[in-house]
Amino acid sequence: MNIQSLINDKVSQALEAAGAPAGSPAAVRQSAKAQFGDYQANGVMGVAKRLGTNPREFAQKVLDVLDLDGIASKTEIAGPGFINIFLSEEFLAKQAEAALADERLGVALETKQNIVADYSAPNVAKEMHVGHLRSTIIGDAVVRTLEFLGHNVTRANHIGDWGTQFGMLIANLERIQKEKGEVSMELSDLEGFYRESKKLYDEDEEFAVTARGYVVKLQGGDAFCADMWKKLVDVTMVQNQRNYDRLNVSLTRDNVMGESMYNSMLAPIVADLQEKGLAVESDGAQVVYLDEYKNKDGDPMGVIVQKRDGGFLYTTTDIACAKYRFEELNADRVLYFIDSRQHQHLMQAWTIVRKAGYVPESVSLEHHAFGMMLGKDGRPFKTRAGGTVRLADLLDEAEQRAIALIEEKNKDLSTEEKAKIATTVAMAAVKYSDLSKHRTTDYIFDWDNILAFEGNTAPYMQYAYTRVASIFSKADLSMDNLAGEVKITDEKEKALITKLMQFEEAVQAVASEGQPHLMCAYLFELAGQFSSFYEACPILNNDDESIKQSRLKLAALTAKTIKQGLDLLGIETLERM
């Protein structure tokens, strides 16, 4: 149950009954401090101002008709017109029982939508680097959350698998094959081939002519070029899948929807834009002028959709992409997890999409932008030599550091256990460090903070789960077969249950806003509430059997909630650390 939504609806009804205009926002929020209740309705003051009446007097009118029977034990007016709402212990205990009996922990399914999520998008013939991390793991966390809420989600890995670079790669691979025979098709080799191909393309005109010819042949469906292109894609995606699997990311080869997929749509789209009077010729190119965007002279900005040589641009592909996702995938929402530097480019493409009538306004096109991952020096994260950090190298280093940390913390574990724990902690640490930050901000990547067992980190959250689970393993009890009823005998119990009952609010916020850090913040607060409860409220050594059983239920619900929350982030838990 989403308690915030429940109360918001009740307050909205009361506002209207008290004379507020229909649709006036109740603005119900979780209270920042316990002294202000569990929830606070902040919408009264805005309505009172519009009505020209005293806010506190209007708040009283709202309270007079507010029906929170069976939900709140107390309501009060505070400050200039806030309404503080204190949840009843009986209501909370009942909700906790229901959540514990439900494998979904009380989280309701939403009305199903078709949602397309565009994320990760590495380039073919290049290894994934740290710049791909954010899109990959943020997108995957949101996708997992949307699926948990019952939505039909199509993962779209929009890989860079088309363009002039394939002409020079194919030409160079053919040259080397003629000299040396079959070429080893490892991605690390292709990285070297790529650099060599670029050098040849820039310095050898004969090679450049051949490469450009192969681009034309590839676009025309030439069998040799198509076969070589497919090999490049296959080798790249095999390597990328290793990274996805290590990171517990749910993308597979079946989710690849690369740039090449839209090739056949580009010319018809440009022709259609011309027919609709949107695309016009300018210096031999086809350009769409947008009044919504101005150049430095204040004139409508021109967006090129076809170059004078007949070639198409990323914008054209993105127009086709949005069109396809609505027409063929029946999308209700399309989410793009692409860095913030691409924002204007996407907005321009979508403006054209709307003007052309390819995607109606009822379909939400959303750019979930993100900031950069920075080194300790505040600059883009690089190797010591100043090069790009390969994602696989970052994950290797995370595992090495985690093994050293675990050997220091727990020398009694077997070598096999240490390796398993190190891998799980390492991948979780890299992911959680990123996911716990607000998506739109840049953040500093610092190994010491990432692997710390204190603060809002993966090791802390994994240990928090292990700590709760150990209560049951020590007592040889199952979390799924607990007797008795939940009862509240201490303020710490009430605070813990209140936080547990806000899980659905966190889940829905991640799904609607595309902000995984909201789940991280929730789980960190939940772990803190459990620590306070655990210190103040004895569990296994409690003399009152009914209180002992009740507290075991709260511990079980806490463990299950942390485990489920971390799972939505793509992070595994451990029974022992």
UniProtKB/Swiss-Prot annotation:
Keyword tags: Aminoacyl-tRNA synthetase, ATP-binding, Cytoplasm, Ligase, Nucleotide-binding, Protein biosynthesis
Domain of life, per lineage: Bacteria
Presence of the UniProt keyword ATP-binding in the record: yes
Short motif ('HIGH' region): ranges: 122-132
Catalysis: reaction(s): tRNA(Arg) + L-arginine + ATP = L-arginyl-tRNA(Arg) + AMP + diphosphate
InterPro entries per the UniProt record, alphabetical: aa-tRNA-synth_I_CS, Arg-tRNA-ligase, Arg-tRNA-synth_N, Arg-tRNA-synth_N_sf, ArgRS_core, DALR_anticod-bd, Rossmann-like_a/b/a_fold, tRNAsynth_Ia_anticodon-bd
Keyword ATP-binding belongs to the record: yes
Example of a GO cellular component annotation carried by this entry: cytoplasm
GO biological process, one term: arginyl-tRNA aminoacylation
Primary localization class, coarse: cytoplasm
Description of how the protein assembles with itself and partners: Monomer.
Name of the protein described by the UniProt record: Arginine--tRNA ligase
Native source species: Aliivibrio salmonicida (strain LFI1238)
